[in-house]
Amino acid sequence: RFLKGKGLFRLLSDTIAPMLKSKPSRLRVTEDFRLFFPDYNNMEISLNLLPKVVYFLFLRHPEGIFIKNLSLYRHELTQIYRLLSHRDNLEDMNESIRKLTDPSDNSIYEKCSRIKRVFLQKMSDDLAQHYYVDGYPRQPKRILLSTGMISFPDALKNIKTVISREDYAVMNLAEIFKNMGIEEK
């Protein structure tokens, strides 16, 4: 009654009802790099700059990324950061990217944890698990959402990678075999 009296019942039911179906929504990244879920009443997820940079990197790599190999993605992270940031302080940007790609620094884990927390604040884990960065130990970390359910602006799609997607996939496979004790001969 309270919610109806305040006119909030309809708003809440329109937002929550689609999420109760436990079916992942499409994810739309706008031209100004905001994140929306069209199938959840256009619910928006807000991330701070560095977690958003990390999130977009993982969205661009559905094959997954081994955290220990993150330095291979430094150029791409820098390009995403420049695209999202309106600051010209290259020193700060380079230091942030250095920390993200340093295996001895926890920065990447902190950013992934923040991403997960933001999604869990907005939806149940059975839905959120499709959207946050996750993975088993000794496996590449990735976002589970199918690439067919993600729409990007061209500016984000057109960022050049230093290494081809195929080479990343081969490196990931080699790392998985190595972790299983299968060495190349």
How should these model regions be labeled?
Residues 3-56, 61, 158:
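Short boundary/linker motifs that mark transitions into or out of structured domains
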Residues 37-41, 95-101:
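Short interface patches used for recognition in eukaryotic signaling and trafficking proteins
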